[in-house]
């Protein structure tokens, strides 16, 4: 390699004292004998020798450039690029002023072409002009042709001193004999064969003037071999520069056999270095590195011993305590990784393990297979020259690189000697380890050619005259004049350009031998210039004489220690392991790149974090600028630095940008210039990432957008396309149309496939909530994909329907009745399995509830179906802990947490066991279904004659198992169309969790019917169903009013009807709103019985007769005719939108039912407290009603009695009569409220029907307050009562008109009605049935009329006297009547049954004043109004019902009982009732 930093002043100032020394390696100037014994008068050949360019023929050899100090140069043939042109430019013509005539005699450029010159006589054209000093010519013998090619140098005759220089063959071929025609006193140099193959023996004339030239000393030109111990060579020893070289200088163990295997985890260059290092530390006779020797090297890395121990553990795969080469290379590789910041792996990857183990196996095989002769060098055709007559010549290592597994070691080269014995041939080509065998006489004629190349042996000699161009001819460092020398850097063979034979005379192609340092492989073309590196100066012109020439690496005096030497390739097979270009590029990059070191980054980051107090990750400009200003740089520099740092021009610096700015500031302070543009090494990584992302976005092709595919999209490959949802007008219109189409086309199959929630099985409350969410969670704007999908689905469904399915055609031989029976059975199976599964789930729920009742837990479950959640357990634990602390304070004993946990565990285990039983039952049901489907599949395949259908397929397509809801609906439609005789049924969906029954699960939806006949039948069926539901609602309303009484008296269970009602009440919370039909059957007989029992135990028979199963027709008859009218009306109005709204209504009813359930639960909690009070109160009420009031026994009173007396009596238990009347009045109010409330949500006050019993409102305080507000107190006549009466009259008139009763005059007789209305409130529950008839149509009330008189005749008489006695001023509660009247009208209009239930009690009041039926009716309305008014008041709070004055209620009961009876039956006289208290 060439060292550009070393001066090679081999000028002629020194040649007077000594001939130029030939640095053939690291030790230049080894031979000085040539000039020491030669007279001064022979300067020309000496100077020619001194002026020869260094010809690096070794691996490391490089041409060295000389300085321009050649003032004393004699004749110097210029062999530069431009013939003699380089004389002026390179050396300057003035340098040759002493002997200008010799300059004219310089050799012309040397053509180094390939023209063979075996047959032409050699003409020395390098000295075309004879020297002017003839006296010196005898001593200056012409240089003999010097064969530097690969041919054999022939004998040359002596030539005269005046004879020009002979041709010098510098090619690679064996030189043919050069015919020299001149004789001279001093024999010229013989042609030297520098080729590769055998050189023919050259005729060497006897030496003449041998005293003038001493034989050359041994020259060591290699890098790693030990220099010869010679006194003059010691000061010129090479300095090993590098970690590897420091060990290599101690010697290499070349006996190690290392297979030529590449390790992929390290580079080839690193592997070569590691191999050299390995050879330097391995002892002789061993193939491994001992632990001690390896420790010396590894400890130099500076790593802590703990890490080195881990590396050793990983590398010592054989656990032998010693490392083979692959293990050693692995250790060095791991150390390098750690030094570069990586971590030591816990385990080697499999690839690395395999490579190391295979390498070790190869080493073991090579050791096992080698024999004693394996160490001998391979035999070559040149072995005969190795020992041929070499005397007193030391072996000279001329190679640069060590013996490695990548190339065969170079043989020693004998380069000097006074004998004509042949030098050992040396192979500089492809892996042939021969040595030079040609001897060279320095000063004696005829040096033997020396083989240095690898070209064929037939190369022609090259002429060195006539404008020879400078040329590098080999790779091994050799002295010119002794052997041809390559001054280039790369081997000349087998790398693409082989040097052709160069004749020394003739117009051949000139071959450039270098004008600059570090010449790359030569090209033999005339105008080809070698590449330059290191900006070296051009090689000076080169003489072909015997001047000493440095051909190896230069002395290490000025050698840079930072540039380790890299070996060079010497053969064709030695791949790029030793290429110098890799190192050069890396060196240039590393030296030129300006980077921020990790130490700087850590320091700058700390500074940044110190000033970034808010942890924003950014420094504002004032702070950053102030930090930069502290450096003392001028404003211009700081501005330039800021522009470079603030890359994004944000006025703020992040951490990386701040570190960059600080680095530039410190660089400027250290004398480095501020760059105009940031180099790539200083650009922050975050900026690079953003720039790369921007470039990718810019370069991404925008024309390759794919159309959106509407198939199934994989989540991994999904990429959103924003263009699909751009808000343009076209998209908006399409979205709206799609939405409207969905809403208006529920009957279309596409809509059914999407909106299938109305027909899915709803088996529990959770599923109901989910369906509500599904309906309400529709996206406001649907995308294109949804619309198109719906259209595609619809088109596919139509195509499927239009295709006839021949597989469904049964075999004609099978009777049609069998096929129809088969189809009917198959159609029934899904529903059957569904019912079985549901029933089993209900049984499971019942078992769980039964267990919980038998084993009540202190933990109250808040989960679905009363399950205990984790939150409940936490609350229970916290309560237990609190109780424990309180007990510790009070000294009481409480249950421990352990008992609580044990109880919880037992309950959980029991519930789990019950659920496991349910799971087993479900599995049994599944097995039965699979077996049935198997049999059915075989039967169907037999009947249709088609292929056998698998069990799973049959279950899937016939039973709908595992199908989407939309697909199941579509299959049902197909089946209904193909088999009209088969009833539609929804596919069976087994539920794994216990769920309550849903009667509506199997009901078809309106959208499923395609034909007009089916739709008409469906509408009729729905009308009937709604009629039944209305009846059920009416009965349920009545039952809800009495639920509290049933709950209070449920434990007493005096009669079976009460027990039935209680059981129905328990079932109700779990039942869905679609089970009203069941309620109709159970409620009708039970309600009247319950109502009569609590209030009047003496006359239960009378109410039961009309209401009991014997006379249920009477209440139902009036109700049924009224409801069908409404149902027909509803069917006409709601036929279009009933399907859409029916589901929502039912869901709302379900939610209301859940709320009622909660209230009923609250009532049950108070049942135990009220039971005893109610029993005593009921007894007292019955006595009073029997003795005093005959009219108070209306059916209304019994219903209200159970609920109201509890609330009223709980507050005022002292006054028995008042409590009775209070109980009566709130009950009536509650009935009135309860009836509209149970109309399924039309009355907003329905919520308080069940909650009235739980109210804690003070009834008496409310009554007194309202009396004062309404002016009902007779003593305090402030005029309010008159206004109230007028208001009541107006309200009554309005109500009468709206109810179509047509008695406004009688309605205006409010004075009587005002007072009795609040008191008579209990009547409505019994009368509801008759009044429903009167309000809706007067024809129907007849059957109901007998019921009220029988009940009313008894209680009214006793009730009337106590009320006026208690408080006579309570007549004015009229104001409440008008509000109630309106409510009654509303209720009556909405549901006539309810209105009828409320209205019957009022008529008794008008009968007192006028016996005519009309006033009675008006008073009935008034009464209802008052009653509803109380209900309206009480709807918001349960105590409003109780707030109605009790005394007024008694008077009204007396007066109102008779009119009611007269309305129904005119035989009842009003005279028995005392007149009402005076009206204001």
From Swiss-Prot:
Start and end residues of each stretch annotated as 7 X 6 AA tandem repeats of Q-[PS]-T-Q-P-V = 1084-1125
- What Gene3D superfamilies does the database record attribute to this sequence? EF-hand
Q: Which residues form a coiled coil?
A: 1131-1190
Record's keyword terms, sorted: Actin-binding, Calcium, Cell membrane, Coiled coil, Cytoplasm, Cytoskeleton, Endocytosis, Endosome, Membrane, Metal-binding, Phosphoprotein, Repeat
**Which residue ranges are recorded for the region named 15 X 12 AA tandem repeats of [SPNAG]-[IL]-[QKNGT]-[PSA]-[QT]-[GQAPISTLYK]-T-G-[YFGML]-[YVMGAQL]-[QVLNPAG]-[ASQPN]?**
142-575
Domain (EF-hand): give its ranges: 269-304, 306-338, 633-668
Ranges of compositional bias, category Acidic residues: 896-907, 1273-1285
Q: Do the record's keywords include Hydrolase?
A: no
- From the UniProt entry, list the residue stretches annotated as the region 8 X 6 AA repeats of [ATVSP]-P-[LVI]-P-[SPQILA]-[VAS]: 1315-1377
Annotated binding of Ca(2+), by residue: 646, 648, 650, 652, 657
**Compositional bias (Low complexity):** 1-56, 80-110, 117-128, 136-146, 981-996, 1084-1126, 1195-1208, 1248-1259, 1309-1318
Metal-binding in keyword set: yes
| Record-linked Pfam families | DUF1720, EH
Mark the residues carrying the PTM Phosphoserine. 747, 757, 1003, 1180, 1250, 1253, 1281
According to its UniProt entry, the protein's GO biological process terms are:
actin cortical patch assembly; axial cellular bud site selection; bipolar cellular bud site selection; cell wall organization; endocytosis; endosomal transport; positive regulation of Arp2/3 complex-mediated actin nucleation; reticulophagy
Q: Where are the sequence repeats?
A: 142-153, 164-175, 188-199, 215-226, 235-246, 328-350, 392-403, 409-420, 422-433, 446-457, 467-478, 498-509, 510-518, 538-548, 549-556, 564-575, 658-680, 1084-1089, 1090-1095, 1096-1101, 1102-1107, 1108-1113, 1114-1119, 1120-1125, 1315-1320, 1321-1326, 1327-1332, 1340-1345, 1346-1350, 1355-1360, 1361-1366, 1372-1377
Membrane topology term: Peripheral membrane protein
Highest taxon above the source species: Eukaryota
- Where is the protein localized? Cell membrane; Endosome membrane; Cytoplasm, Cytoskeleton, Actin patch
Q: Which residues carry this modification: Phosphothreonine?
A: 241, 570, 993, 995, 1321
Q: Where is this region: Disordered?
A: 1-147, 185-214, 737-766, 888-909, 977-1147, 1169-1480
Annotated family? Belongs to the PAN1 family.
Write down what this protein is called. Actin cytoskeleton-regulatory complex protein PAN1
Q: Which organism is it from?
A: Saccharomyces cerevisiae (strain ATCC 204508 / S288c)
């Amino acid at each position: 390699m060439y060292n550009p930093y070393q001066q090679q002043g081999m000028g002629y100032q020194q040649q007077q004292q000594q001939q130029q020394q030939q640095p053939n390696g690291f030790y230049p100037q080894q031979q000085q004998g040539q000039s020491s014994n030669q007279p001064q008068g022979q300067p020309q050949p000496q100077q020619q020798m001194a002026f020869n360019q260094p010809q690096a023929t070794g691996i490391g050899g490089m041409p060295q450039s000389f300085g321009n100090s050649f003032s004393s140069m004699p004749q110097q043939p210029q062999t530069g690029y431009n013939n003699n042109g380089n004389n002026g430019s390179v050396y300057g013509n003035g340098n040759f002023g002493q002997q200008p005539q010799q300059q004219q005699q310089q050799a012309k450029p040397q053509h180094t072409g390939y023209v063979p010159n075996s047959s032409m006589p050699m003409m020395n054209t390098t000295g075309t002009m004879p020297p002017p000093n003839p006296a010196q010519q005898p001593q200056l013998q012409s240089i003999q042709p010097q064969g530097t090619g690969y041919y054999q140098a022939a004998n040359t005759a002596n030539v005269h001193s005046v004879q020009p220089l002979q041709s010098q063959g510098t090619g690679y071929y064996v030189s043919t004999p050069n015919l020299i025609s001149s004789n001279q006193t001093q024999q010229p140099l013989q042609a030297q064969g520098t080729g590769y193959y055998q050189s023919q023996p050259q005729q060497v004339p006897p030496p003449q003037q041998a005293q003038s030239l001493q034989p050359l000393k041994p020259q060591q030109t290699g890098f790693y071999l030990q220099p010869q111990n010679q006194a003059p060579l010691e000061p010129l020893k090479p300095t090993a520069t590098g970690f590897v070289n420091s060990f290599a200088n101690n010697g290499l163990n070349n006996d190690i056999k290392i297979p030529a295997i590449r390790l992929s985890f390290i580079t080839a260059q690193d592997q070569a270095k590691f191999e050299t290092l390995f050879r330097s530390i391995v002892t002789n006779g061993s193939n491994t590195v001992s632990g001690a020797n390896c420790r010396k090297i590894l400890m130099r890395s500076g790593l802590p011993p703990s890490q080195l121990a881990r590396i050793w553990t990983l590398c010592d795969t054989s656990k032998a305590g010693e490392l083979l080469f692959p293990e050693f290379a692995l250790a060095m590789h791991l150390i390098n990784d750690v030094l570069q910041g990586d971590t030591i792996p816990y385990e080697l990857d499999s690839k690395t393990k395999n490579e190391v183990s295979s390498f070790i196996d190869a080493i073991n095989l090579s050791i096992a297979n080698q024999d004693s002769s394996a160490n001998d060098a391979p035999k070559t055709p040149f072995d005969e020259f190795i020992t041929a007559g070499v005397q007193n010549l030391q072996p000279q290592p001329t190679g640069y690189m060590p013996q490695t597994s990548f190339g065969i070691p170079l043989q020693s080269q004998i380069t000097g000697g006074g004998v004509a014995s042949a030098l050992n041939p040396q192979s500089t080509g492809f892996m042939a380890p021969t040595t030079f065998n040609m001897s060279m006489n320095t000063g004696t004629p005829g040096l033997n050619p020396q083989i240095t190349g690898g070209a064929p042996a037939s190369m022609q000699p090259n002429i060195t005259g006539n404008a020879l161009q400078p040329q590098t001819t080999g790779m091994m460092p050799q002295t010119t004049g002794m052997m041809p020398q390559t001054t280039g850097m790369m081997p000349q063979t087998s790398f693409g350009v082989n040097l052709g034979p160069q004749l020394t005379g003739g117009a051949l192609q000139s071959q450039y031998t270098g004008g600059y340092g570090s010449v790359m492989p030569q090209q033999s073309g005339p105008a080809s210039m070698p590449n330059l590196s290191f900006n070296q100066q051009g090689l000076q012109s080169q003489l072909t004489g015997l001047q000493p020439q440095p051909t190896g690496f230069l002395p290490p005096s000025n050698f840079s220690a930072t540039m380790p030497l890299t070996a060079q390739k010497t053969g064709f097979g030695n791949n790029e392991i030793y290429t110098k270009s890799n190192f050069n590029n890396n060196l240039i990059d590393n030296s030129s790149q300006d980077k921020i070191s990790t130490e700087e980054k850590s320091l700058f980051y700390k500074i940044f974090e110190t000033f970034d107090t808010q942890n924003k990750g950014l420094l504002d400009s004032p702070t950053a600028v102030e930090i930069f200003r502290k450096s003392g740089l001028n404003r211009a520099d700081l501005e330039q630095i800021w522009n470079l740092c603030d890359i994004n021009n944000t006025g703020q610096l992040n951490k990386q940008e701040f570190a960059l700015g600080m680095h530039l500031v410190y660089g400027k302070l250290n004398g480095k210039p501020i760059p105009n543009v940031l180099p790539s090494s200083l650009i922050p990584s975050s900026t690079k990432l953003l720039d790369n992302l921007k470039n990718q976005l810019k370069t991404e092709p925008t024309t390759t957008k794919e159309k959106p595919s509407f198939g199934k999209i994989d989540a991994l490959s999904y990429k959103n396309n924003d263009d699909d949802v751009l808000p343009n007008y076209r998209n908006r219109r399409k979205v709206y149309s799609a939405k409207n189409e969905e809403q208006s086309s529920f009957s279309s199959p596409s809509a059914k496939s999407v909106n299938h929630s109305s027909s899915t099985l709803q088996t529990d409350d959770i599923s109901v909530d989910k369906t509500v969410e599904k309906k309400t969670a529709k996206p406001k704007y649907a995308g294109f994909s949804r619309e198109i999908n719906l259209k595609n689905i619809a088109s596919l469904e139509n195509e499927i329907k239009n295709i006839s399915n021949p597989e469904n055609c049964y075999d004609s031989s099978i009777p049609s009745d069998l096929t129809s029976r088969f189809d009917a059975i198959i159609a029934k199976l899904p529903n059957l399995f569904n019912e079985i599964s549901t029933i089993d789930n209900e049984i499971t729920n019942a078992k769980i509830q039964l267990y919980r009742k038998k084993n009540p837990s202190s933990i109250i479950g808040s989960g679905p179906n009363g399950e205990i959640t984790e939150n409940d357990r936490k609350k229970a634990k916290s309560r237990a802990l609190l109780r424990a602390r309180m007990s510790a304070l009070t000294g009481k004993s409480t249950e421990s947490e352990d008992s609580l946990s044990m109880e919880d565990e037992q309950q959980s285990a029991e519930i789990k066991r019950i659920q496991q039983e349910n799971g087993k039952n479900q599995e049994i049901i599944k097995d039965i279904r699979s077996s049935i489907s198997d049999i059915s599949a075989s039967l169907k395949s037999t009947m249709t004659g088609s292929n056998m259908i698998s069990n799973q397929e049959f279950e899937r397509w016939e039973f709908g198992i595992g199908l989407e809801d939309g697909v199941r609906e579509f299959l049902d439609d197909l089946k209904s169309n193909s088999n009209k005789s088969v009833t539609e049924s929804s596919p069976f969906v087994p539920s794994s969790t216990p769920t309550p029954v849903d009667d509506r699960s199997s009901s078809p939806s309106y959208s499923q019917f395609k034909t007009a006949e089916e739709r008409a039948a469906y509408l009729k069926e729905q009308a009937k169903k709604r009629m039944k539901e209305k009846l059920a609602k009416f009965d349920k309303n009545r039952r809800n009013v009495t639920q509290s009484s049933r709950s209070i008296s449920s434990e007493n269970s005096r009669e079976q009807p009460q027990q039935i009602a209680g059981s129905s009440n328990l079932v109700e919370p779990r039942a869905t709103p679609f089970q009203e039909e069941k309620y109709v059957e159970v409620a009708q007989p039970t309600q009247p019985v319950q109502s009569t029992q609590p209030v009047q135990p003496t006359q239960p028979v009378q109410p039961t007769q009309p209401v009991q199963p014997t006379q249920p027709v009477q209440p139902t008859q009036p109700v049924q005719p009224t409801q069908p009218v409404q149902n027909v009306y509803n069917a006409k109005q709601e036929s279009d939108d009933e399907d859409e709204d029916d589901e929502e209504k039912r869901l709302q009813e379900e939610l209301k039912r859940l709320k009622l359930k909660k209230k009923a639960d609250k009532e049950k909690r108070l049942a135990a407290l009220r039971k005893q009070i109610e029993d005593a109160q009921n007894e007292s009420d019955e006595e009073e009603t029997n003795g005093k009031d005959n009219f108070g026994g209306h059916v209304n009173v019994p219903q209200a009695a159970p609920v109201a007396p509890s609330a009223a009596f709980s507050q005022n238990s002292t006054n028995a009569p008042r409590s009775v009347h209070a109980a009566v009045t709130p009950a009536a109010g509650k009935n009135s409220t309860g009836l509209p409330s149970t109309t399924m949500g039309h009355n907003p006050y329905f919520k308080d029907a069940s909650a009235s019993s739980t109210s804690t409102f003070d009834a008496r305080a409310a009554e007194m307050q309202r009396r004062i507000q309404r002016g009902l107190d007779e003593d305090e006549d402030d005029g309010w009562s008159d206004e109230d009466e007028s208001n009541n009259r107006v309200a009554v008139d309005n109500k009468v008109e709206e109810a179509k009763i047509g008695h406004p005059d009688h309605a205006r007789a409010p004075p009587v009605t005002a007072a009795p209305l609040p008191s008579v409130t209990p009547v409505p529950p019994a009368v509801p049935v008759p009044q429903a008839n009167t309000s809706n149509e007067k024809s129907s009330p007849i059957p109901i009329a007998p019921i009220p008189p029988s009940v009313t005749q008894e209680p009214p008489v006793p009730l009337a006297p106590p009320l006026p006695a208690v408080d006579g001023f309570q007549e004015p509660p009229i104001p409440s009547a008008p509000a109630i009247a309106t409510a009654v009208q509303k209720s009556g209009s909405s549901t006539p049954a309810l209105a009828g239930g409320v209205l019957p009690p009022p008529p008794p009041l008008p009968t007192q004043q006028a016996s005519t039926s009309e006033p009675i009716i008006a008073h009935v309305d008034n009464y209802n109004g008052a009653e509803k008014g109380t209900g309206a008041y009480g709807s918001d709070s349960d105590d409003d019902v109780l707030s109605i004055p009790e005394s007024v209620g008694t008077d009204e009961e007396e007066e109102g009982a008779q009119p009611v009876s007269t309305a129904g039956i005119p035989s009842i006289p009003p005279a028995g009732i005392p007149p009402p208290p005076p009206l204001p």
